[in-house]
């Protein structure tokens, strides 16, 4: 693992790279203006070793047109001292940038993890698609020798949606991201509920209780089957 990541190591075009001597971000400047508790501020200071602006994905560098809202995607490396990620502060900063710029500036975090890196994004709520509150999504770990971060889309709005999809769903499709996230999260929740009901059913001794749990299991299994078919159908349409 190199001492420092660069935009090109991540698969981003060299034209988007911020020069190393200009990319360092002071911690104080990062959380200044955020409404965070003293405890969160201390956690942020203690957990983060350094912050570096690696790249700026904008129309003037890439030639990709601005989106309806999105004009810039800042790619920020968050180098940790240990394994704990101060997710609450990273979410607050991304939310703050989003609100202050009227959704024009988004943040893609890149977090080195020893053997590769993870990405993280803040995604706003979208109640109509089943996302009831905005939150930070963190990807699985990626190796540096793979394809890296991909810029996909006809404008920066789609590029942002694709980056969110790469982070939350492990694919680059920019279509129906919130809907697909909501389906994936519902599947995960129902899968956990299915396992809980199976365990409870195996332990139950009374016939009435076993029948009740079996009926609940059938309902959960039916919904899981429906959602998984919907997820597959959506993937085929978007592919």
Predicted feature residues:
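N-terminal/domain-start segments enriched in small and hydrophobic, helix-friendly residues
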Residues: 1-7, 11, 18-19, 25, ...
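N-terminal, leucine/charged-rich tether regions that mediate assembly and partner docking
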Residues: 1-112
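Extended assembly-interface/linker segments at domain junctions
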Residues: 86-172
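Peripheral peptide segments
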Residues: 129-130, 182, 232-235
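Short, charge/polar-rich alpha-helical segments
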Residues: 170-187
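Non-transmembrane amphipathic alpha-helical segments
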Residues: 183, 187-204, 220, 224-227
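Short, charged, amphipathic alpha-helical segments
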Residues: 207-218
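Amphipathic alpha-helical coiled-coil segments
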Residues: 219-239
